[in-house]
């Protein structure tokens, strides 16, 4: 017979101490500093910031260190800390067209105003292990030059000017805030994009991949992917004008998708949109693909795949919520299991007795 297993504070404290010891590792080796994580594991920091909802590289690096490199645990830590922060102001909408570019590519036009800029990327590597890194080699040297950045309008604005795509218009409405108001379905576009930005990268990547394999009407081209620094401004009440409070490294992706032919409009391309912190390019692309898939009802398209089901996609995208629900199965369920056990034994006795 199953009985309750008793534990206590001492056992829990010992478990935490053991975890801290494993996190530190061999104390004969130098401890990994938060600054090293921030600078040298920058893509992991970008993901934790994006899905954790705080644009603070030091805090994201600290969370990664505390979580022993577990991204989901680090995201959980950052989300928990976020709930303790006061909301001091709301920033002005960012203008990504004025981004100080680090990288900009387009898969639909070779020559675009402002040009293409490869920037930092793993795209053209051979994916072979670099064993020289085991020797703690020298810092890579870069040649430095000064260049003027030409105006770099969005590729979608060029399509819109030709009547090939609809221009996005600011309605002036206040965006939803999913940190203050729980999402409901169907939800607004602003709520959807916020949930996708905070959604798990692997989950969104799988859904985006599914749209390319026929589970949803989606034939995309990467109209533009741009990464760089964006100015952040707020308007203090006592001043009444915008004040620059810093800049953020962000990545934006716009996917141009198959065209539609509405009755009262000219046929035009549709778009999917993604925007994330840092250089999380894969996440931005997946977000843009899923965003377009979720627009299926807006265009009267048949729902043919899971990526087009808004409630299914968004209700399961949050890895903190998902990990919490799955992890709760580790908690004691002795009474529940005892009930199942007694029922099973009774059914076996009834079958044995005919």
Where do the language-model regions lie?
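Short, amphipathic alpha-helical interaction segments embedded in low-complexity terminal/linker regions
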Residues: 1-227, 241-243, 349-354
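Acidic, serine/proline-rich low-complexity intrinsically disordered regions
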Residues: 143-354
């Amino acid at each position: 017979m199953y009985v309750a297993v008793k534990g206590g504070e001492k056992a829990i404290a010992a478990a935490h101490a053991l975890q801290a010891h494993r996190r530190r590792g061999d104390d004969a080796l130098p401890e990994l500093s938060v600054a090293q994580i921030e600078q040298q594991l920058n893509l992991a920091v970008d993901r934790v910031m994006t899905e954790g909802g705080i644009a603070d590289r030091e805090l994201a690096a600290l969370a990664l260190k505390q979580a022993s490199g577990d991204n989901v645990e680090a995201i959980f830590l950052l989300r928990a800390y976020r709930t303790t922060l006061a909301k001091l102001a709301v920033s002005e909408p960012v203008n990504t067209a004025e981004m100080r570019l680090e990288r900009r590519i387009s898969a639909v036009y070779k020559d675009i105003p402002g040009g293409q800029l490869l920037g930092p990327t793993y795209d053209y590597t051979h994916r072979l292990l670099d064993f020289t890194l085991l020797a703690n080699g020298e810092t890579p040297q870069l040649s430095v030059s000064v260049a003027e950045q030409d105006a770099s309008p969005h590729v979608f604005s060029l399509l819109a000017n030709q009547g090939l795509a609809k221009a996005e218009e600011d309605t002036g409405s206040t965006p939803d805030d999913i940190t203050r108001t729980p999402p409901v379905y169907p939800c607004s576009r602003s709520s959807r994009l916020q949930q996708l930005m905070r959604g798990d990268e692997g989950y969104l990547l799988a859904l985006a991949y599914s749209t390319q394999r026929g589970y949803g009407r989606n034939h995309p081209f990467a109209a533009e992917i741009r990464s760089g620094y964006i100015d952040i401004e707020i308007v203090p009440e006592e001043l009444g004008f915008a004040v620059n409070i810093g800049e953020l490294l962000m990545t934006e992706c716009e996917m141009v998708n198959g065209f539609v032919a509405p009755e009262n409009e000219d046929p035009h391309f549709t778009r999917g949109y993604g925007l994330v912190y840092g250089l999380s390019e894969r996440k931005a692309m997946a977000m843009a693909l899923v965003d377009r898939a979720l627009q299926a009802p807006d265009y009267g398209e048949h729902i043919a795949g899971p990526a087009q089901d808004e409630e299914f996609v968004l209700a399961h995208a949050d890895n903190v919520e998902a990990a919490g629900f799955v992890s709760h199965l580790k908690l004691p369920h002795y009474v529940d299991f005892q009930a199942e056990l007694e029922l099973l034994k009774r059914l076996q006795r009834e079958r044995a007795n005919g």
